[in-house]
């Protein structure tokens, strides 16, 4: 035997010259040539972790207090003397007690979780929104259950049903499409819903959003100020309200400048992703130079970055041949090969404000008044549209 069967507790899988396995004492092994450590005692997972759950009664006995005192330490620690809290906590730590949240939730009819259902958590914009919401929830003693609809209406519906079944304290929703009837039904059954990054005409709900019509307007106004004659809007699907609003703002800027709506070429994408931006870039690059737009406003930064990548690959210079403006001002925008001009949204503040409104309604519905919070966007000008305007920010409020 040229190799020991064991090296420091590791079983060595040995192979013959034909690539077959040499089975060790433990039986057959795979022929992938890696080392596998074996548990000599061969306990099951259940045996390793044990099966006996410690209850509150055991904690009370060990701490020398009543069951009610343990309950107060867990649920209302502010009314328990610090010395008693410490004694109960020592008993909890010694026994390894973990309270049954499901049972507590069943008794109370409420939970310490809020649902957060986003359009696309792979988009850094929604990641930042989620971070803001999570921070506000944590400060209030809640945790966040994060769900991703992937811009799919049926998937969104399944998650809404699941979150309601789990009796979350409330739902933060960035919807694919607003269904007033469905959301009204959820609210009537006792689960508050706050819309995030989406405006609503209903006065019976809270929402937190950005003025996307204004955002589209300032983006295209910026490009028109630079003398661009052939403009394109890149975005989709138009089922998503944010895309509609940003396009509407772009058209408003064009018409105000004395141009026709049909002078804004529309390149529709299936999704708001980097890959869709690259495909849009191929469409633009394949056009004859005399018909190719000289500026593009993209419905979000991922589309804009994908477009920028494809332009670079095809030898179309940005901004000399094509100026590009995105939307969201995600962290990657400033660090792109050609730093990307973008309409900035207060991403984390959107999430934080929405979570605060949701928890306010959930904890004191009889005092809550629905509010609409609309932030103003801001155009951040960088090199990708520098031919138009350079060296400053054009604030939407001006």
Label the predicted regions:
Residues 7-113, 392-398:
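N-terminal helix-turn-helix DNA-binding module of bacterial transcription factors
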Residues 13-16, 23, 28, 157-214:
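Short beta-strand-centered segments that line the small-molecule binding cleft or hinge
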Residues 28, 282-398:
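Flexible loop/turn connectors
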Residues 67-72, 106-122, 222, 230-237:
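Short beta-strand segments enriched in small/hydrophobic residues
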Residues 82, 97-170, 248-251:
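Amphipathic helical "hinge" segments at domain boundaries
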Residues 101, 118-128, 146-155, 181, ...:
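Hinge/beta->alpha junction and helix N-cap segments in small-molecule ligand-binding domains
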Residues 167-175, 232-235, 267, 289-300, ...:
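Periplasmic-binding protein-like
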Residues 229-231, 261-265, 317-324:
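Short acidic capping loops at alpha-helix termini that bridge into adjacent secondary structure
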């Amino acid at each position: 035997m040229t190799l020991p069967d064991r090296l420091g507790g590791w079983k060595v899988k040995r192979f013959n010259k034909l690539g077959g396995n040499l089975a060790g004492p433990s039986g057959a092994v795979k022929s992938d040539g890696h080392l596998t450590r074996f548990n000599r005692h061969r306990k099951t997972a259940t045996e390793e972790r044990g099966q006996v759950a410690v209850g509150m009664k055991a904690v009370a006995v060990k701490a020398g207090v009543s069951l009610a005192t343990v309950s107060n330490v867990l649920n209302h620690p502010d009314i328990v003397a610090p010395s008693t809290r410490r004694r109960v906590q020592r008993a909890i730590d010694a026994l390894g007690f973990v309270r049954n949240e499901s049972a507590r939730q069943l008794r109370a009819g409420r939970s310490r979780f809020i649902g957060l259902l986003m359009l696309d958590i792979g988009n850094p914009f929604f990641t930042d929104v989620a971070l803001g919401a999570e921070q506000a929830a944590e400060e209030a003693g809640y945790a966040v259950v994060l769900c991703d609809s992937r811009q799919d209406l049926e998937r969104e519906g399944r998650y809404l049903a699941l979150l309601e079944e789990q009796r979350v304290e409330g739902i933060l929703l960035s919807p694919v499409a607003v269904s007033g009837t469905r959301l009204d039904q959820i609210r009537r059954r006792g689960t508050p819903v706050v819309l995030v990054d989406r405006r609503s005409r209903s006065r019976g709900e809270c929402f937190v959003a950005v003025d996307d019509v204004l955002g589209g307007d300032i983006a295209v106004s910026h490009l028109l100020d630079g003398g661009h004659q052939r403009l394109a809007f890149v975005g989709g699907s138009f089922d998503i309200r944010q895309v509609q609003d940003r396009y509407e703002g772009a058209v408003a800027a064009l018409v105000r400048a004395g141009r026709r709506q049909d002078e804004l070429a529309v390149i529709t994408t299936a999704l708001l992703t980097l890959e869709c931006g690259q495909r849009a870039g191929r469409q633009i690059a394949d056009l004859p130079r005399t018909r190719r737009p000289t500026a593009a406003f993209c419905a979000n930064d991922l589309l804009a970055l994908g477009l920028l990548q494809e332009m670079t690959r095809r030898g179309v210079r940005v901004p000399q041949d094509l100026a590009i403006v995105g939307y969201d001002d995600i962290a990657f925008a400033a660090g792109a090969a050609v730093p990307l001009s973008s309409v900035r949204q207060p991403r984390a503040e959107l999430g934080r404000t929405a979570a605060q409104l949701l928890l306010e309604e959930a904890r004191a519905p009889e005092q809550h008044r629905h509010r609409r919070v609309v932030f103003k966007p801001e155009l951040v000008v960088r090199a990708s549209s520098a031919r138009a305007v350079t060296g400053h920010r054009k604030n939407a409020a001006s």
